[in-house]
Amino acid sequence: MRAGAEPDVTADAHRLRPDHLPTPFSADEIRAGCPPGRTIRSLVVRAGSERYVRVTRFVSGDADGAEQESWTETPDGDRLTEPERSRSTWLEYQEHASMPAAETEIGEEEIDIPAGRFACLRYTRIEGDSVSTFWFGGSAPGQPLKFEQRMKGELVFSSTAIENIPGG
């Protein structure tokens, strides 16, 4: 879908601002998809740095939000940092995926990543020389399962889910 085109999603729960495209998931869909125990392990690659794995686990949740803990590991599973806990509302999680219509295109794409095969909504946001691409798995509400950032066409950062544990 080109920026500025009328989106197919008509539910108000997906559109947080009139000048933004609909988000891939509503706050309620994220809540349902991120019960305690939901864990995502993602391989992070940053230009000029060693690869590492970022682990995010939902610890608890209620009608308003969730507490999660996150830490980093080596690709072999050795812990690099201690878990840090944070709490966000479900709406705050949703707001991370709210993107300006004037800078963003939405498409559909199937991806094969180490965490599995997913039918995704692909959001591509262009800001000057920066292109950020987010792949949100329809069967895995919450954070993107894959993310890439390019500057002047060069890949400078990526995060790819290597494991997606549903929890609950």
Enumerate the language-model features and the residues they cover.
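Acidic, serine/threonine-rich low-complexity disordered tracts
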Residues: 1-168
